[in-house]
Regions:
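Structured, basic alpha/beta domains of bacterial-type, RNA-associated proteins
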Residues: 1-19, 23-145
């Protein structure tokens, strides 16, 4: 029984989860907004908020902690974006740097999908790129005519 165990396993091995969150976090930092499943988005939220907190602390230690969480070629680039662009925007905020907006279920497998984005930071992608998962109004849907 998994009593008092934090986090979702997402049906992946530990190394696969580590790589998944590293890649999702890097994409979120670069694009400021991504679309993913609800479960991944909920886990990614705490992962990214910790990275922003490290960036706010700044210094060599914070940079190394970020690069430890996002290894590889993109680690330095992500650390620079977090420290120089994102962290200053949240200097007066104590947490809650991201928001999760639920969208329609994905068409092919009906998976619940969400948009995760940074609060108060303009995204780099356009609304047309996000339109594939926009909200449906009540009453809309597949109606036979």
């Amino acid at each position: 029984m998994r009593h008092q165990k934090k986090g979702r396993k997402l049906n992946r091995t530990a190394s696969h989860r580590k790589a998944l969150f590293s890649n999702l976090a890097a994409s979120l930092v670069i694009h400021k907004k991504i679309i993913t499943t609800d479960a991944k988005g909920k886990e990614l939220r705490s992962y990214v908020e910790r990275l922003v907190t490290y960036a706010k602390a700044g210094g060599v230690h914070g940079r190394r902690l970020i690069q430890k969480r996002i290894p590889g070629k993109r680690g330095k680039e992500i650390a620079n974006i977090l420290i120089h662009d994102i962290a200053p925007a949240y200097s007066d905020r104590q947490g809650g740097y991201t928001r999760l907006i639920k969208l329609n279920n994905r068409k092919n497998d009906n998976a619940p999908v969400s948009l995760i984005e940074f609060i108060d930071i303009a995204p780099d992608i356009t609304e047309a790129e996000v339109d594939e998962g926009t909200h449906k109004e009540k009453g809309e849907g597949n109606t036979k005519e």
